[in-house]
């Protein structure tokens, strides 16, 4: 019997090993295909100020319509919140759920989620097998390779054994049911596009990992430890996080890293957490320069400490949010992010050493004085103050638009229904 050469035996063993590992790839940044810089940045807009102006214009129009109708004595369900005014007034919202996909604003306005797909009804709250999930479960829905609009048959508490890895073109729509994702793994949006997460209670998320988890119909892989974020956005684009109630997680409530962009985070109620929102991977990760995020109409509520958000490199439009509590600071950053704060209400805590809204993290003033951090039309209460820098601080910044953030006095009203709404069929969706 002929003896095969050693080099040939080694090659055969290698090929066998690669084939065996086809479905068990280590799902980290090094194992996934790299894009060139043009592809990576293709979802970022060239003039982010134009997108910010569009948000202001939509808000101004909604506020004006709401105010004028009330003056004329008409009942109106309008709130001055252009997202909500787009769909919430319809008592038959449940018959036209996909209308929501046309209501986005800001950098994530083009996120269509599963609009062009069929409905998938989650009937089973269990999560027995993260590699081979049973039909009817949320995990089985989100891994499908086709667009889906995911809804829930009834109220349920879903305790995930591992992080829930969401595939592209998915909407998770909790309206009409009281849906909690809690006490286990939570949501990961990794290297995908067009995802909408709406109407969920996400809390008490735990670190998970060192396990196999399925991410699509055709792929599962070994996952290292996840941090325990409520929602983790990783290298993804066209993502909209709207009307969720988020609290008590091991790491962040919403984190977006590794070049994620075209994101809107809106109408959420965030409470009881330390490091709330991280936007940007690290000071040395240059691809986060393309990160563009709109943070609008959220209520940053009781029990929050810092990072609302904490930004790196990109462009961040913080508009018409209600900051009623923080313990250290509200908005922080490093690595020269642009922060455009407009029409927010900042109510400082009683602590005399925590009145400043802003914090430049581990950076001397000689560096951050050139960063473009600007405050326009913000309502500063209880001694709160915003330290501007860059062109805004020097007085040389001039808006190309005549728009201004005029609605800070109405922020309490605009954000009064932030968080997951108790929607019921046949009624307008309101708290």
Curated annotation (Swiss-Prot):
Keywords attached to this entry: Calcium, Glycoprotein, Lyase, Metal-binding, Signal
GO BP term, pick one: pectin catabolic process
Molecular function GO terms recorded: metal ion binding; pectate lyase activity
Reaction catalysed by this enzyme: Eliminative cleavage of (1->4)-alpha-D-galacturonan to give oligosaccharides with 4-deoxy-alpha-D-galact-4-enuronosyl groups at their non-reducing ends
Assigned EC number: 4.2.2.2
Tissue specificity: Expressed in flowers, but not in leaves.
Pathway(s) annotated for this protein in UniProt: Glycan metabolism; pectin degradation; 2-dehydro-3-deoxy-D-gluconate from pectin: step 2/5
Cofactor binding comment, as recorded: Binds 1 Ca(2+) ion. Required for its activity.
Cofactor(s) needed: Ca(2+)
Annotated signal sequence range: 1-20
Residue numbers annotated as active site: 307
Keyword Transmembrane helix in annotation: no
Recorded family membership: Belongs to the polysaccharide lyase 1 family.
UniProt xrefs under PANTHER family: PECTATE LYASE 1-RELATED, PECTATE LYASE 18-RELATED
Protein name as annotated: Probable pectate lyase 1
Organism: Arabidopsis thaliana
Taxonomic classification: Eukaryota, Viridiplantae, Streptophyta, Embryophyta, Tracheophyta
